[in-house]
Amino acid sequence: MAPDEGDQAMSLQEEKPAYPSLSTTSSAELLHGAPLNDNERLDILQTAEHAMHRGSPKVDPHIWTNVTSHFSDSSTIDGRQRDILFERLTVRGKGSPFQIQQTILSALLYPLAYPIKRLVKLVGKKESHDGPGTILRGLNGIVCSGELLLVLGRPGSGCSTFLKSLCGYLEGLDVDTASEIQYKGVPFTTMMEKYRGDVVYNQEANHHFPNLTVGQTLEFAAHARAPHNRAGNQRGDQCQWRGKKESQVSLALFSLGGERTEGKAMRTDTVGMNSIAETVLSRASIVAWDNSTRGLDAATAVDFVRALRTSAKLSGSCHALAVYQASETLYNTFDQLILLYEGREIYFGSRERAVPYFESMGWKRPPQQVSADFLTAITNPGERQPQVGMEHAVPRTSLEFEAYWKSSPEHAELQRSMQQYKQKTPLDISEEIKLDEVKRLEQSTHARPSSPYLLSVPMQIRLCIVRAWQRTRNDIPGLVSSAVAQIVVSLIIGSLFYNIPQTTAGLGQRGSVLFLAVLTNALISLLEINTLYSQRLIVEKQAAYAFVRPFTEAIAGVIVDFPVKLFRCALSAIIIYFLANLRREASHFFIYILFQLTAVMTMATMFRTLATVTRTIGQAMSLAGVIIICVAVYTGFTVPQFDMPPWFAWIRWVNPIFYAFEAIVANEFHGRHFECVEYIPSLSFQEGLSFTCSYVGSVPGERYVSGDAYIAGSYDYSYDHVWRNYGILVAFLVFFYVLYFWLTELIPGTTPTHEVLIFRRGDAHPKLSRSDLESGEQPRPLQELKSLAPPAHPSMAEQKDTLSWNGVCYDIPVKGGEKRLLDDVSGWVKPGSLTALMGVSGAGKTTLMNVLARRMTIGVVTGDMLVNGHEPDASFSRKTGYVQQQDLHVETCTIREALRFSAALRQPQSVSTEEKYKFVEEVIQLLGMEDFAEAVIGNPGDGLNTEQRKLLSIGVELAANPQLLIFLDEPTSGLDSRSSWAICKFMRKLADNGQPVLATIHQPSAVLFEQFDRLLFLAKGGKTVYFGDVGHQARTVLEYLEKNGARQCGPTENPAEYMLEVIGGGTQGQSTPIDWVHAWKNSSENTQVLEELDSLVSSPSNAIPADPCKLSEFAMPLAVQFHHVMKRDLQQYYRQPEYILAKFGAGIFCGLFIGFSFWSSDNSSQGFQNVLFSLFLLCTIFSTLVNQIMPKFLSRRALYELRERPAKTYSWTVFILCQILVELPWQTLLGICTWASFYFSVYGDDQSPQRQVLILLFTVQFFLFASTFAQFVIAAVPNLVLGSMMATFTFLLCLLFNGIMQPPSALPRFWIFMNRVSPLTYYVGGISATALHGRPIHCSNRELRVFDPPQGQTCGQYLAEYLKTAQGTLHNPLSSDRCQYCPLRVADQYLAARDISWHDRWRNFGVFSVYIIFNIIGAIGLYYLVRVLPYAMKNRTQKSPT
């Protein structure tokens, strides 16, 4: 708790009298005793808070729920109690039952195929359905307040859809019009519109702001839903104080700390508990929990459900939970139960009567099978077992089960109960009035009565402002890095135009520096898109919870960002303004800042609006690229208004930067006279009107140029437009604000995704075409008994190796010292044994597995880890299989391709490809994946579902045919009990075939636990509690615990839950009088373990083979690795048309837009300048290309470094080379397409083929440089934000110093070297010299310098001496007045001023090629130095002698 928060809390506590402590109050007293008053409950909160600050783990969840539920008078609670009645609930899904994988060819043919497809639909037979079909079919039931409903069913049966439907989360779903859902007399639509916060859905995915601590996250939730006008007329600050206390006790209840909510920085169980606590603090009357116990150990899951049970009884709330793995203890906590089978209801009623109902139907419950598993097994034809003699009497299909249910007495009783309930609580206004009264008591004073939110809009905005400020304050590194980047860019721009002279020599430089200042400040706002997309899911969730409206978060973001933007703008303005020597007048300086700030705010809001209306960040970035080009071209600087093509000239009127730039330029030049430094003619005798200044806006006979005349002649700007433009700019700002706020409320934040299987064209399995799906989920694997048949694997490698570890410790550096995660852990895994690794949450199970697999990249590992008594050799990693918790795969591959890739590169070279692929087919059959082996993996939420991904992860490791050991980290996490059982049986089969297996597991049932031979049990801190045999019915481990003082395990208890309980597991970490770590160290069992370890070392077996191929780090040579990896990468690109088409769309559009904007530039000086600026603008596509390439590289790098490199699948050189080379063909083709789209429109078709080909080569070079540069930058950096910042900064340097914006001769001496090292200098120089060499210049009327000759002389006579050395031409030598002089004769003179020469074109081509080669070498070198060498050194030094 922050100091200011603590002071506030103490001051509030001092106002209250001291009450007797109620910390000893029992749960029974709370449930059945006299009700507590508010003062007593406040005392409980304070006691719980003090216990939390003292580090006490004992915060009773029952006490906590009593206080949070009863912090008001009973009438308020009675009014908030809601029941749920659903009748004839039928829900259909949107979308296709399965999809066909798109490729580049199919995407290109789509415009032709779509009309044909529509025509066939019109004239052909109408399809039976347009979506994946009916998910839920006629469900009926009622859940009363105070009850818990357990939702059971196999994945794909409709459990998630059922929960979503109850809570009104209907994105992607259609509810049948005959369906009825009511909440104690309140209709469904009314409940969703007016009382949405009382009905919430806790989804399995967790989304939180990464820059908030857990405490801040929960405090926001508590404040958003804390009642603000309770009985007793308590003040608003006391309500806020209560919200703070509730959030603090939530931290203690769910064992959460002050760490950030970012998922990567926290364990899975911690993130899940954070979401659970947030949902509890929503104070909803009805909550649906979708597999929310995933990732929690058994004891913690039970504690969580018990807390919900207490909350339901005390507050009258009701909860529906879908649980895939429910222990008997957890099962007995529920009141009601619904069982779904293929979307049909086959039972609804009392939990106690569910098992007897199905037993009376004729089904047999196996011994030791928990009730939930038995009920779920009923819906699986391959698992359920009929009683003897009932084989032909029991129902078989879901239709038969539904018919049996509807004809049963239990269903008739349910119908009677529902009819009685509807008569008692009809759909009338009375219940709505009662609920309105309760809501008004809880709402703030100024909240709209019909609003589902408790806070008024101003209070929501204030709350969001506090949170936005917390996020900003917690992101100090981000703020500092962005400020440093802004300072550096400003310093570069300011020093590039350092001390611009107050003469005509600085006129062009002033325009350039103002253009760059406006453009860079405005385009930094592009990052707003990333910010908005990162918080979109969070804002959508909290709007569904009725915390705050989406537009209030948008307003808060704008308000909190304003001082940051003001600071950045002011900082940038001060640096650029004074370094460049712009107008030194206070009024003009502040006008400059005003327009800069307004332009930045306008562009930021424009990009936020763009992010709101798009569905993916790729779409937003593509459209943003279009906006950037339009903004840059049509400001009036690169293309003056009088040269704008009529078909695009209108763009400037809708371009906010056009108005800002005109005003800033006019502000700088208005009312100023710039002394001329170059005259025409430059003769010693000049008098009258016989000379003029050689700059736009000059007047014959005047020795200065008026600033107003200059901007009028150069840009067609006027000072009269300054404040008109500001009004228009503010109008743009207001318009985008209103549009942005409105769209955040109107448009949903996300498009629902469905786990629909994706197949390559022609590969869809026929069995899947008529599947009954939930959100596109396909029939589950492992559902037939044949999948459990004993496997026959003649090709399985013979296992003879033993992995042992002794005294393993692991320390990591933390602030202020080191933290020990593993402490003196010993054990072994022998061939043919299945070992379980268990422990409380955070005990170090995954850490130990990573240490044993030699996958740790930080910290110090000590102790012995040996294979057959020897140090592991270089082949150790590839000989082990490691199934991680994260299912990481290449999303475009099919299952069969992924398995073949693993087999081809990880099985020994001595095994032929045919044998490897044959083995893959055996793995597919063993895992029961035949029906979807050709399915594309896809991304999470779109493609394989959770179970299929887990099976694939196991299959990938099994396909490698590991010769040593298989590690499985939480292989059953997120799976239903049937799938978990099947996977454990599969591990058992592997062990029976001689394969040593080590697996972590956190929620095993008693039957599942018996599959393991040995157990390694860890306590908090990575300390050993037990290592040894499990025994029949776990008697060996139970006897050990009981003889050391644990209570006796009951005959129906789950041994896994029992063990967690007796050592102090669960959310509260219940204290135990027994020091189990000390007991183990002094036990005879530990002595036996150490003796066995000594024997394994003293009598090593299986000496290391001499064959060097068997000891090599990789199974296959580099050439074979390169072949398979390159083939996969090429396939990936071909199967991602959205990536390739976005790349080509950006390039072709950019080329066409620039081409038509600079259409057929004439031979005037302005025309040649337009040609150069067209190259400058074409370079802006560089940033878009780089930002497309880098995320793709990072995703592939993550897969390689997290899974494929530790497994020694292939070498790092193969990885980096393939990543570089796979881009080059597409970049080459993109360069050709871009050249064709802009070359002829800008340069015409009258140039020689040699010049056309050379410009084509330069264009292709540019795109090759862009891809290799992106990989050079991102190869070593840790994340996309840093990579994008570095790439943008480097590109900006190259762009600024390429000679277009500032000629080399005008650069400050310090920056001259940058012109020479900028790759774009050679690109621009090569193309412009090739395109413009030898072209004559014909000045336009605006560019001609007009003056009168002395009386009695013609223009030719007057300028005869001057023309001998001048570069220009005289148009009318015989005229005696108005001499017309063009300052330049040929384009080469124009280019020479920028140090560009025709003779250097091939040199430029060669130098630019060298930069491409440098990028490739640099990417390889940096990746090795930063990502490979430290990893290799860590692996070499990870093992230390004991």
Swiss-Prot record:
Pfam families: ABC2_membrane, ABC2_membrane_7, ABC_tran, PDR_CDR. Residues 1-24, 768-797 are annotated as: Disordered. Residues 120-367, 803-1045 form the ABC transporter domain. The chain crosses the membrane at residues 476-496, 513-533, 558-578, 587-607, 620-640, 727-747, 1139-1159, 1171-1191, 1212-1232, 1254-1274, 1280-1300, 1405-1425. ATP binds at G839, V840, S841, G842, A843, G844, K845, T846. Its main location: membrane. GO terms for cellular component: membrane. It is a multi-pass membrane protein. Keywords: ATP-binding, Membrane, Nucleotide-binding, Repeat, Transmembrane, Transmembrane helix, Transport. It is found in: Membrane. ABC-type transporter; part of the gene cluster that mediates the biosynthesis of the meroterpenoid compound andrastin A, a promising antitumoral compound. Is required for the production of andrastin A but does not have a significant role in its secretion. Belongs to the ABC transporter superfamily. ABCG family. PDR (TC 3.A.1.205) subfamily. This is ABC-type transporter adrC. The gene is adrC.
